[in-house]
Amino acid sequence: LNQMKKNKIEHYSDKEALEFHNSNKSGKIEIISSKPMTTKRDLALAYSPGVAAPVKAISQDPDLAYDYTTKGNLVAVISNGSAILGLGNLGAIASKPVMEGKAVLFKRFADIDSIDLEIDSNDPEEIINSIKNFSKSFGGINLEDIAAPDCFIIEKKLKKILDIPVFHDDQHGTAIITTAALINAIHITKRDIKKIKIVINGAGASAMACADLFKSKGVPQKNITMLDRQGVIYKGRKGLNDWKSLHAIETKSRSLNEAIKGADVFLGLSKAGILKKEMVKKMSKNPIIFAC
């Protein structure tokens, strides 16, 4: 706790953020050569006529693209901007700063090169076909900030038709770190994972993925209450899509105020400020809260 107090989150103004993105070169990424480009020979090897040798080799064995190109260490960071974290549907080009940001995180923490690609479409099949058609250039696909349920459709189809890894960050990235935090919090507060009661506010991609991973670790489905804009997702509620129906439970609770009573864990995956002080008081002793 003392260490957490020392590592206070710094806050920045919109002006500072805009200046950061516009300083020196605009944006956050650039492409540089991994080979020397100082002599005429270097240029000839890098382009014509030198490229002919790897081109012919790859044409005979496509897997050699992993040896002679950047494919094996190149990820496509893809979005249509339909569910930008904390901002909603602002369109493809508006999501570009986020995708560039993810690209620099890949480079900074894993030395993985990546290119951001913003697809201006809200048609899942159109997005799937676009990714399919350029996927051969990449070693992996990172999907991000695509609204549910389209993100589920897109990910499922791509995993079926592509021969490279497909990772939906909002689902799996969020679920992995949240589940790790939950396991630690349960250990610290001496709780039994099979007995804890969890309330998840939000029913998008990240919420559903977290719920699924919680269940795989031992949390009973009946102990997880999920809410969307209309309230608690309960069995028998009209208008639920196929994905939300999988998380419906038998409960008399219809609102967050009702569902939070006696809860051990609150996970906020919608907008900030939903969980009020009065609600926290209704939770169990030493509640575990993941919220902004």
Per-region residue spans from a language model:
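Structured core elements
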Residues: 76, 116-118, 142, 199-200, ...
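A short, aliphatic-rich alpha-helical micro-motif
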Residues: 135, 193, 259-260, 280-283
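A generic local secondary-structure boundary/capping motif
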Residues: 63-68, 131, 188-189, 213-216, ...
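ADP-ribose/adenylate-binding Rossmann-like module
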Residues: 142-145, 169, 267-292
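Short acidic loop-to-helix transition motifs that present clustered carboxylates
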Residues: 121-127, 148-151, 171-175, 232, ...
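Glycine-rich phosphate/diphosphate-binding loop of Rossmann-like nucleotide-binding domains
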Residues: 85, 92-110, 162, 168, ...
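N-terminal ligand-binding/catalytic initiation module
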Residues: 4-166
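Short gly/ser/thr-rich secondary-structure transition/capping motifs
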Residues: 56-61, 246-252, 271-274
